[in-house]
Amino acid sequence: MIGGLFIYNHKGEVLISRVYRDDIGRNAVDAFRVNVIHARQQVRSPVTNIARTSFFHVKRSNIWLAAVTKQNVNAAMVFEFLYKMCDVMTAYFGKISEENIKNNFVLIYELLDEILDFGYPQNSETGALKTFITQQGIKSQHLTKEEQSQITSQVTGQIGWRREGIKYRRNELFLDVLESVNLLMSPQGQVLSAHVSGRVVMKSYLSGMPECKFGMNDKIVIDKQGKGGTTDDTGKSGKQSIAIDDCTFHQCVRLSKFDSERSISFIPPDGEYELMRYRTTKDIILPFRVIPLVREVGRTKLEVKVVIKSNFKPSLLAQKIEVRIPTPLNTSGVQVICMKGKAKYKASENAIVWKIKRMVGMKESQISAEIELLPTNDKKKWARPPISMNFEVPFAPSGLKVRYLKVFEPKLNYSDHDVIKWVRYIGRSGIYETRC
């Protein structure tokens, strides 16, 4: 159970305060401000224990959300509530900022009254909350008895994430497979660590209470132990199987069918939601290979050559490519020659930034630079920070594929063929580094 919830600004001033237990006093507010927000050293742990009181906290921009308790609670449950609270506030009034919180403080208190009951999370589904809590306040005073009973059955029923009676002139379903690939590679091209974090995000604008079925690769292996590490950089993203280390689903998914059929069956919420989140470390398709060559010419000059190779199908096009090549602190000047794109030395960042708008698969490009160094008495050698890379590719580096996406709605008499469906793959770089 949660004893209290506090929302602070970057100065440590309390914007929202709700206490659910008598054992949480004003001293808890001050303790968090002094020991976390105003701490001399940055607090890295998301859980802070002060005088037998536990503070679970997350930060959004310059806003802190802290759940406080003196009990031995389930930490995962508390963080799930905090992240859900952030999602709900974003859905209601956009960006979480001090100004937006002050302008919507009445709304936030109304939401807390519905989401938390005596410190226990109850209902955090945005779709259900929006049926009776609006930007203008609670709607229940103007609802008929039939509408009130409909809300009650939605919140307390088996399908609390979707209300009945939804109608659209055109039934549409959008599915995005969003992945972030992280890599650390040695100068010789050996993969030291690699993993992909992925999300399946859907936007459903469907009438009635449809049943959706979503199928992925023919074989999906859930490896709870996560012993992965091998990678595949052949550039072929047509894998028939995928090994997932761990995954979580939206509450609408029927897990029994996923275990037996490896298909996801669900009644979707209305609007945008995250259907699935997963992580994999096996058989990753590395979109780019970075080949660095650094040569020291005496003590006042460096010659750097970097080649990037795209390891995916020639029919695909990568975008927003950026390579950051670090330079020593005593750099006095840089001369750059690049075959493609634009490159510029940024002295304030101690790096050469090379940008390429687009690049097709199975191609390579290179950049050469001569770096002039100022004489220095420092005998310590340059540490050679890794070369980092940013990009966006139109495929899933994990190899995840959507085999089918079907919709059934027997009551309203529309079939799968009447639904307009869109599937999109977006792979982005996370921390994508190559040592030099």
From Swiss-Prot:
GO molecular function: clathrin adaptor activity; lipid binding
Residues binding a 1,2-diacyl-sn-glycero-3-phospho-(1D-myo-inositol-3,4,5-trisphosphate), per UniProt: 342, 346, 355
Superkingdom of this protein's organism: Eukaryota
Keywords linked to the UniProt accession: Cell membrane, Coated pit, Endocytosis, Lipid-binding, Membrane, Protein transport, Transport
Membrane topology value: Peripheral membrane protein
Record's subcellular location: Cell membrane; Membrane, Coated pit
Family: Belongs to the adaptor complexes medium subunit family.
The protein's role, per its UniProt record: Component of the adaptor complexes which link clathrin to receptors in coated vesicles. Clathrin-associated protein complexes are believed to interact with the cytoplasmic tails of membrane proteins, leading to their selection and concentration. AP50 is a subunit of the plasma membrane adaptor. The complex binds polyphosphoinositide-containing lipids.
Protein's UniProt name: AP-2 complex subunit mu-B
Organism: Danio rerio (Zebrafish)
The encoding gene: ap2m1b
